[in-house]
Amino acid sequence: DEAEILAEILNKTPQARIIVGATPAVDLEAFSRIKYQFKAFGLADRVEMSSDQKYTDQMIVDPDYWNSIDVFIDVGRRANPTVIADSLWMGVPVLSLKGERPFDRLGASLVYTAARPGWVAETREDLIKLTVDILSDAGALSKTRKTLRNEMRQALLFNPEPHVRSVERAYLRLLGREVPTS
């Protein structure tokens, strides 16, 4: 389950912690349930709630939240596409587990569309290794954080028009019609 995956990551990265509460949708009751799950692993003290919520909209992430985390880990089941897209746009790498069911693959699909296939893990073991590897190289992570937002401006996820134009041209060719040059 998700807590087991995250607990294993915490065990392999002693400096890491989990910060929940990217949106106001995570209230104190939900946070208590999350923290309780990690108590079984002896890791409850490394689970924190983002305390600086300036927004009340359940879907808006406080921009300061993105400065407080190094990576966003999507374990599949409860993927929030808006938060995943926000994370990438704000320069935070999203490491995603490609699940079995279509809904469990939503985060992975967004990460692929953001031109980051190396951030998608096929198995839970792959996700754990990927996360530990990325968190272990502070220099590379810092560089990624500095350049990711600018790179996302060109990614299909945030810039779909060139792809749509390409598909339109392919359809026109299939129909035997003239393809515009612009």
Give short role names for the model-derived ranges.
Residues 55-69, 89:
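Short acidic alpha-helix that forms the nucleotide-activated donor recognition element
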